[in-house]
Amino acid sequence: MSKQKELFANEEIAEAEKTKLQPPPMYKVVLNNDDYTPMEFVVEVLQKFFGMDLDKATQVMLSVHYSGKGVCGTFTAEIAETKVVQVNTYARNNEHPLLCTMEKA
């Protein structure tokens, strides 16, 4: 028997417990409808901050307009928070009351 086997023959070797990684919680970034922000500005925001093409941005804008809110995307908490701040800051800087929020997906 080899020396290494002899050293551990009478001892149990503990295996490192493998921890299962959980995916991070996800959050939806949502635009909320108001009566003052122009539809064109909403489309601009969706293209600028969410990388949507014109057709997709128009579709989401119409969802905001007719349903009261529209989902811009689903992200991890940090990214969602950043996008909410970016959109709200951009809207205020352009004197629009557009409100962007986040909610658990």
Swiss-Prot record:
InterPro entries the UniProt entry points to: ClpS (IPR022935), ClpS_core (IPR003769), Ribosomal_bL12_C/ClpS-like (IPR014719)
Q: What are its GO biological-process terms?
A: protein catabolic process; proteolysis
Question: What highest taxon heads this organism's lineage?
Answer: Bacteria
State the Pfam families in the record: ClpS (PF02617)
Q: What binding partners and quaternary form does the record give?
A: Binds to the N-terminal domain of the chaperone ClpA.
Q: Which PANTHER family match?
A: ATP-DEPENDENT CLP PROTEASE ADAPTER PROTEIN CLPS, ATP-DEPENDENT CLP PROTEASE ADAPTER PROTEIN CLPS1, CHLOROPLASTIC
The record's similarity note reads: Belongs to the ClpS family.
Q: What's the protein name?
A: ATP-dependent Clp protease adapter protein ClpS
Q: Which gene encodes it?
A: clpS
